Amino acid sequence: MKALHFGAGNIGRGFIGKLLADAGAQLTFADVNQPLLDALNKRKSYQVNVVGEQARVEEVKNVSAVNSGSPEVVALIAEADIVTTAVGPQILARIAATVAQGLITRHQQGNTRPLNIIACENMVRGTSQLKQHVFAALSEDEQRWVEQHVGFVDSAVDRIVPPSEAGSTDILAVTVETFSEWIVDGTQFKGQPPEIVGMELTDNLMAFVERKLFTLNTGHAITAYLGQLAGHQTIRDAILDPAVRQTVKGAMEESGAVLIKRYAFDPQKHAAYINKILSRFENPYLHDDVERVGRQPLRKLSAGDRLIKPLLGTLEYQLPHDSLVTGIAAAMSYRSEQDPQAQELVTLLAQLGPKAALAQISDLPADSEVVEQAVSVYNAMQQKLAH
């Protein structure tokens, strides 16, 4: 199996790339970070530190790398059996032209073996969005051929992979938690789905996408935002603070009530899933900074993301949402010198005031009860900070 993976960052190396390599794939990473590419090509392997109750070091072997702007990438797409990505939602649109070029070359070469493309991003149906961008760069004739021979497979991914420790001398080493989940839409493959240990097939992907978004992502973000307000440095410090934990768990239970209603999840199993996630946030071996996890607050406060989407579900089913609203107010309070979206958030709050700013960012009606509620909690948070 020939595999091409876009994004040789920590998630690419520590999660998706690792599973592909473990499945015996001939794996090539595509990235723009030249020192990283050089190191991968020189060593052909790297180490993954899996940390948790039982820490272990696993070696990933037989890998190579190419620059994602190079002609080699196009040639690799023409030959590959599977193409995956972990580049971040913003970059996905940027690699579409390259993917399209690779598919055109594949067609020209008469390669009709099935190819499956799987975007492994923190977004809902990311591969379907990638497909739209790719199709925008294809003629109608090419589109017809691609529809026949190429599967665009949506997925949900979950593994906490913090940035490398400062002072780590090995550019390729990566640290990951023990837990990992990669769930793919089994209905979207062309040909037989590849056998990859750790990749699970489902015919109800949206249930898993929302379960992860409404629990892991919602909980992680609110832990970061409340943690920063309380002066904590890491996610672990924040979740061990009883006041933070109570709101985070409350928010996950509120979003969980939406999932239970929407997808008929078993309430006891879902409660166990929430507790599992809380214990992952407590992992003492993952030094995950609240400022990093809170980054891009405008995206995280948008209508389809981890804070507003579950809130909309609670409104749809007339369910409680106080903890989610507190999380939204905490997201409005996020500050970071390093993050452009945090700066933009501050500007919007100053120019429009909290009510109009939240309405603009989230698409919630400015005069709605939840916006009023969020603004009142936000104002109380700001007053507390001022004292």
Swiss-Prot record:
NAD(+) binds at A3, L4, H5, F6, G7, A8, G9, N10, I11, G12, R13, G14. The keyword Oxidoreductase applies. GO terms for molecular function: mannitol-1-phosphate 5-dehydrogenase activity. GO terms for biological process: mannitol catabolic process. It comes from the Bacteria. It holds the Pfam family Mannitol_dh. Keywords: NAD, Oxidoreductase. It catalyses: D-mannitol 1-phosphate + NAD(+) = beta-D-fructose 6-phosphate + NADH + H(+). Its EC number is 1.1.1.17. GO terms for cellular component: cytosol. Belongs to the mannitol dehydrogenase family. This is Mannitol-1-phosphate 5-dehydrogenase.
